[in-house]
A protein has these predicted regions:
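Sec-dependent N-terminal signal peptides
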Residues: 5-13
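C-terminal motif of bacterial Sec signal peptides marking the signal peptidase cleavage site
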Residues: 15-17
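Residue-level hotspots at or immediately adjacent to binding/recognition sites across diverse folds
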Residues: 21, 25-322
Length: 322
């Protein structure tokens, strides 16, 4: 009996095992199939904008042009609202820029001088034997004069070639009423009719003070400097009088426009109450600008990685920077 029952039992076991395997066939097959592939997409980095320390600015031919650190050149054709990067061809520090005779001329460290006749689109290097730093440049009567920490140089061909004129340590220069006037250390004031010799020394009354900026407007010359120094000349730079600035911080630059003289400096903006510059008042605080210019009804000021615009010196709008 036991022998006859063994075969059915074995058969039943085999049949049952095969049935179990057949029932799990789909699960086994599914487990062997590869799962969905997860693809990781690296996000495209957001482009970063590099802002430069801007040191000088001017207006000409309806264009504002600013210059600064590492050869930076910026241009604006919409009254300072937007700015385009230019290519100067140098990495040297550019300290100041001027316009005249359909040409922009920029000067900077190590004797760097550049000129552009296409509104700052392209730049060429001028020829000079000097290697000192230049801080100021101005144009008048078909002449460009540049000033720096060791000498004054002059160009009569729109910045293409330069001649060394004399040895002075001066910081800035302007042109008005057929004369160049420069300002500098220890209250220095120098004057020349055509940028050539002689450069005559004038008494400023600012001994011991470095005069950083100078401008001409409404037949008046104004210069500004350390400790809030502000001086004025109404006789073409021959004599100078002190004007209370209402501030004690350093003033770096001054410009004329909208019937007032406006000066900028360390954490301050001041302006005259009328076009004679007899009295000045504080317009704004908290702004440190290194240079200011005026054009098309707008003041444009530059500083460390910033550019601001204003029509009245009170309200300022940032148009460039971090």
């Amino acid at each position: 009996m036991k022998k006859r029952l063994l075969f059915p039992i074995i058969f039943a076991f085999i049949f049952s095992s095969c049935s179990d395997f057949s029932g799990n066939e789909d699960a086994v097959e599914a487990s062997l199939k590869p799962g969905p592939v997860t693809r990781t997409t690296t996000p495209t980095p957001t482009p970063t904008t590099t802002y430069y320390d801007m040191d000088g600015i001017t207006f000409g031919n309806n264009i504002f042009v600013a210059v600064g650190d590492k050869g930076a050149v910026l241009t604006s054709s919409d009254n300072g609202a937007t700015w385009d990067n230019g290519t100067s061809g140098t990495k040297k520090q550019l300290n100041e820029i001027a316009y005249g005779d359909s040409t922009f001329v920029a000067v900077g460290d190590d004797g760097t001088n550049l000129y552009s006749s296409d509104n700052g689109a392209t730049w060429s290097s001028g020829t000079t034997t000097e290697t000192s730093d230049y801080d100021g440049v101005a144009n008048g009567d078909n002449v460009f004069a540049a000033v720096g920490n060791t000498n004054i140089i002059r160009s009569t061909d729109n910045g293409s070639t330069w001649s060394t004129i004399t040895s002075f340590n001066v910081k800035d220069v302007t042109f008005g009423n057929s004369r160049f006037i420069a300002c500098g250390t220890d209250g220095a004031i120098k004057e020349s009719d055509d940028g050539d010799n002689p450069w005559l020394s004038r008494t400023s009354g600012a001994s011991g003070i470095t005069l950083h900026g100078i401008t001409f407007g409404n037949n008046l010359f104004f210069s500004v400097g350390g400790s809030g120094k502000l001086i004025k000349s109404s006789d073409n730079g021959t004599s100078w009088v002190n004007i209370p600035s209402q501030v004690s911080t350093t003033l770096y630059s001054i410009a004329y426009g909208n019937n007032m003289f406006l000066a900028v400096g360390s954490n301050t903006v001041i302006a005259s109450t009328d076009n004679t510059g007899s009295t000045f008042g504080i317009k704004a605080t908290g702004y440190t600008f290194e240079d200011v210019t005026f054009g098309n009804g707008v003041f444009v000021a530059v500083g460390y990685k910033i550019i601001y615009t204003s029509t009245d010196g009170i309200s300022w709008t940032q148009v460039y920077g971090e």
